[in-house]
Amino acid sequence: MNASFAPSSSFVAGLRHDWSRAEIKALFELPFSDLMFQAQSVHRAWFNPNEVQVSTLCSIKTGACPEDCAYCPQSARYDTGLEKEKLMAVEKVIEEARAAKASGATRFCMGAAWRSPKGKDMPYVTAMVKGVKSLGMETCMTLGMLSEAQAQDLADAGLDYYNHNLDTSPEYYGEIITTRTYQDRLETLDNVRKAGMKVCCGGIVGMGEEVLDRAGLLQQLANMAEHPESVPINMLVKVGGTPLEREADLDPIDFIRTIAVARILMPKSHVRLSAGREQMNEQTQALAFLAGANSIFYGEKLLTTPNPEANKDMQLFNKLGIKPEAYDVHETEEEQEAALVHQLEEAKLDAFFYNAAR
């Protein structure tokens, strides 16, 4: 949160954790201009509306995931043509982080396609955290489910953020995933909080869900005892070979409504415009920023789907008068990072990238 845009006491007092599904549905049903005005008003009370947080993401282990998430090309259950890669060497990860820092990065996110890390993996991932932290960078990981002990190990290594998405509403969840329960996800988030790390948690829209399911997802997030510091809102990226490859496109206005409602419900969180941004034109992205999105992944790729080229991002920022949010080493409540250009993976994976942070 930008110190020069500190919220008023009335907005602080207005933070809620008791939203009903009916209240959230009513927000979704507001006339579009009214919803956008309300979201932008909340956004301006907490953030500089002309700054967007910029993140980068490195896949440290790609493919061969045993889960059956219907949207994800990293699942071993689907023939998507994605080539699996084993865990990246610690030295290589640190080299990637060093290159990212040289390009202006202040925060480095690492993702692995696992159901959960095995005991033999933990020394390597904690070494990655320590190595990246030694460069003076902020760190984030997404490795699947975590036990209390694993979460504590990551926290002890210095990990700042852990990403674990809920994906959708509790009611629709079974249509998308059967190999991991909703409660499994909530327990991992509890373990992350208990260990003292910050939470990055959101979901995916456009998977065939109803408006009530989007309301249900946001209700789960907004009614947590502490709002996630980062809330990624992903638009489904349809990848050939996955069960959702022929899913109907979500209307962009419905996507913008989801961003706006997320901003209203979670005023102090960074709302991240994440996967699916490549399919969005400049006008849709501009509306998303107006609705309260203030974080993006920057660079050529996410984990398994293409991402808009970095120079295009900066061109759009220039058109809109947006600047990358500066990182303040004295502020630890919210993610803060500067713009960066960083090659994330080999070109052979270009057709198969998707933000598989789960």
UniProtKB/Swiss-Prot annotation:
Per the UniProt record, which EC number(s) apply here? Answer: 2.8.1.6
A GO BP entry: biotin biosynthetic process
Return the Pfam families for the record: BATS (PF06968), Radical_SAM (PF04055)
InterPro entries found in the cross-reference section: Aldolase_TIM, BATS_dom, Biotin_synth/BioAB, Biotin_synthase, Elp3/MiaA/NifB-like_rSAM, rSAM
Q: Which reaction does it catalyse?
A: (4R,5S)-dethiobiotin + (sulfur carrier)-SH + 2 reduced [2Fe-2S]-[ferredoxin] + 2 S-adenosyl-L-methionine = (sulfur carrier)-H + biotin + 2 5'-deoxyadenosine + 2 L-methionine + 2 oxidized [2Fe-2S]-[ferredoxin]
Q: In which pathway does it act?
A: Cofactor biosynthesis; biotin biosynthesis; biotin from 7,8-diaminononanoate: step 2/2
What SUPFAM superfamilies would the database entry show?
Radical SAM enzymes
Purpose: Catalyzes the conversion of dethiobiotin (DTB) to biotin by the insertion of a sulfur atom into dethiobiotin via a radical-based mechanism.
Query: What family does this belong to?
Result: Belongs to the radical SAM superfamily. Biotin synthase family.
Stored NCBIfam families: bioB
User: What is the designated name of this protein?
Assistant: Biotin synthase
Lineage at the top is:
Bacteria, Pseudomonadati, Pseudomonadota, Gammaproteobacteria, Cellvibrionales
Q: Which gene encodes it?
A: bioB
